[in-house]
Amino acid sequence: MRHGVSGRKLNVTSSHRAAMFRNMAVALIKHEQITTTLPKAKELRPVVEKLITLGKRGDLHARRQAFAQLRDDAVVTKLFSAVAERYKGRAGGYSRVLKAGVRYGDNADMAVIELVDRDVAAKGQDSGPKQNVAEEQEAA
């Protein structure tokens, strides 16, 4: 019996699930909107809500707890400055999940998870590795 067992397994191991939610949370805080499957989006929402609540607390212990989960200095800085400031007057409900049809390849239900009152300019910002490696080496 599954009494009191919460959360989906998503057909991956627990370490894979933890890493996946870490990466998805980093992407969501960085870009403020991501597209994923509906079950993953529904499971990601409480993870991100708790991180934003840590950001609103703003003390050193909260920052260390957020870094332990996210492991990305730039994203933790954004979380504790811009994102926390935006939601200081809101008591929860920082993200929303919108259904986005089905995926062409396997007919999986897709969803868009985004931060409420998001910064539209953040979408696509700093996504992926830099293409101009030669220019970077010349500068160094």
Swiss-Prot record:
Q: Name one GO biological process term.
A: translation
Q: Name one Pfam family in it.
A: Ribosomal_L17
Q: Which organism is it from?
A: Gluconobacter oxydans (strain 621H) (Gluconobacter suboxydans)
Q: Mind telling me which PROSITE patterns this protein's record contains? A: RIBOSOMAL_L17
Q: What is the lineage of its organism?
A: Bacteria, Pseudomonadati, Pseudomonadota, Alphaproteobacteria, Acetobacterales
The record, for NCBIfam families, names: L17
State if Ribosomal protein is listed as a keyword: yes
This chain belongs to which protein, by name?
Large ribosomal subunit protein bL17
Query: What's an example of a GO molecular-function annotation for this chain?
Result: structural constituent of ribosome
Mind listing the UniProt keywords for this protein, alphabetically?
Answer: Ribonucleoprotein, Ribosomal protein
Encoding gene, per UniProt annotation = rplQ
Q: Does the keyword Cell wall biogenesis/degradation apply?
A: no
By sequence similarity, the record places it as follows: Belongs to the bacterial ribosomal protein bL17 family.
- Stretches that traverse the bilayer: none
Subunit relationships: Part of the 50S ribosomal subunit. Contacts protein L32.
